[in-house]
Curated annotation (Swiss-Prot):
GO terms for molecular function: ATP binding; phosphoribosylamine-glycine ligase activity; phosphoribosylformylglycinamidine cyclo-ligase activity. InterPro entries: PurM-like_C_dom, PurM-like_C_sf, PurM-like_N, PurM-like_N_sf, PurM_cligase. It comes from the Bacteria. This is Phosphoribosylformylglycinamidine cyclo-ligase. Its EC number is 6.3.3.1. The lineage of its organism: Bacteria, Pseudomonadati, Pseudomonadota, Gammaproteobacteria, Pseudomonadales.
Length: 351
């Protein structure tokens, strides 16, 4: 009877040395994102972070998210550099709408076979996103799981914790009829609607890698990283105290996300003609023959964030946002009403 040869973890498909090599490569990324409140570096069992000084009744705000099937498109195109920015954006933008300052971020990277170069590019993007948001990358998990994922395919999840003064939590409770709605532009589809986008690409037979739109590579338009709104919005909150509610426009578009911050007895009235929809959305609508209302229910259509302020604070809010580098515009207002349609879209284009 032949003796069973000695097996190693590597024989089973898990390369511990590759994992350790990745950790060494990303330590510098984590150091660049450090905040003074963070205690220690990567490698411990848990990450420690103090509450920043100056808070009287600090409330921690947490969030977790992924990037959906945009990840599949990233893998197909070999574009791994900015998907980490998307991951951070999806988490920190959800925190800032509560008025919270993001403190720290952790990531989860799962794959069938670890490609250290790809993973390092992804984590470098995560670090870039953390720098843009002002939060520290304090740790994460890299899981090599042969048999769970196909080859070097990978999945991502992000986790973020922020802090807000209890008396300054923004929850929409003060929103009232007559208030104004200000929009901030998106960079493209951000990280939502990509199952529809991929189906449109498939059925239209589009060569994503080779196609262009208005002289720009279609791949770049579709893979543009999700914008991170943290710093301009925190500036708006702190300098004006005027923000009553904010809605991060993700999956569900304007029609599903704005109602999440509206109190009973109010509805949002949006003027779709108040902005020029980026060409990539019109291209997707045409190629997929997508109904106009479906477009606004699935995609952000050029609007990444909506901010509610009192009507007499509009000019001040617009000025602060412009000074922070944003290009805001007045997109609509709040009206009284308890109907089933919490968001009314006016001036929808004919399709």
């Amino acid at each position: 009877m032949s003796k069973q040869p000695s097996l190693s973890y590597k024989d089973a498909g898990v390369d511990i040395d590759a994992g350790e090599a990745l950790v060494e490569r990303i330590k510098g990324v984590a150091r660049r994102t450090a905040r003074p409140e963070v205690m220690g570096g990567l490698g411990g069992f848990g990450a420690l972070c103090e509450i920043p000084a100056g808070y009287r009744q600090p409330v921690l705000v947490s969030g977790t998210d992924g990037v959906g099937t945009k990840l599949r498109l990233a893998m197909n195109l070999g574009k791994h550099d900015s998907i980490g920015i998307d991951l951070v954006a999806m988490c920190v933008n959800d925190l800032v709408v509560c008025g919270a300052e993001p403190l720290f971020f952790l990531d989860y990277y799962a794959t069938g076979k670890l490609n250290v170069d790809v993973a390092a590019r992804v984590v470098a993007g995560i670090g870039e996103g953390c720098e843009m948001a002002g939060c520290a990358l304090v740790g994460g998990e890299t899981a090599e799981m042969p048999g769970m994922y196909e080859g070097e395919d990978y999945d991502l999840a992000g986790f973020c914790v922020g802090v807000v003064e209890k008396s300054e939590i923004i929850d929409g409770a003060k929103v009232a009829a007559g208030d104004a709605l200000i929009a901030l532009p998106s960079s493209g589809p951000h990280s939502n609607g990509y199952s529809l986008i991929r189906k449109i690409l498939e059925l239209s037979g589009t060569d994503v890698a080779g196609a262009t739109l208005d002289g720009k590579p279609l791949a770049d338009l579709l893979m543009a990283p999700t914008r991170i709104y943290v710093k301009p919005l925190l500036k708006l909150i702190r300098e004006t105290g005027a923000v009553k509610a904010m809605a991060h426009i993700t999956g569900g578009g304007l029609t599903e996300n704005i109602p999440r911050v509206l109190p009973q007895g109010t509805r949002a009235v949006i003027d779709v003609a108040s902005w020029t929809r980026p060409a990539v959305f019109d291209w997707l609508q045409e190629k997929g023959n997508v109904d106009e209302r479906e477009m606004h229910r699935v995609l952000n259509c050029g609007v990444g964030m909506v901010v509610c302020v009192a009507r007499d604070k509009v000019e001040q809010a617009l000025a602060v946002l412009r000074a922070a580098g944003e290009q805001p515009w007045l997109i609509g207002d709040i009206a009284a009403g308890d109907g089933a349609e919490r968001v009314q879209l006016h001036n929808l284009k004919a399709h």
